[in-house]
Amino acid sequence: MEHHEDLHLIVVSPESTLFDGKVEIVTLPGELGSFSVLYDHAPLISTLIKGEIKYTEDELEKSIGISSGFVEVRDNIVSACVEI
């Protein structure tokens, strides 16, 4: 029996909401290297560096280019506040 769980990804900049929706996986450009977040990931807070936030939505990989920011992961919600 296959059971699929989703994360909720929210990416905001000072100007607008860049993405707000369900994703299967998100990969973020952390200060110590890129890292991926899946469903039921441990809580964390991290700074983000220049790079791309990559995520899979409806089996399609998409990305958002950023210059810096920070991210919080908690209760299957990935909240990123970024500069683009």
Regions found by a protein language model. Name each.
Residues 1-6:
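Short, charged, intrinsically disordered terminal tails
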Residues 7-84:
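Compact, glycine-rich, soluble single-domain proteins
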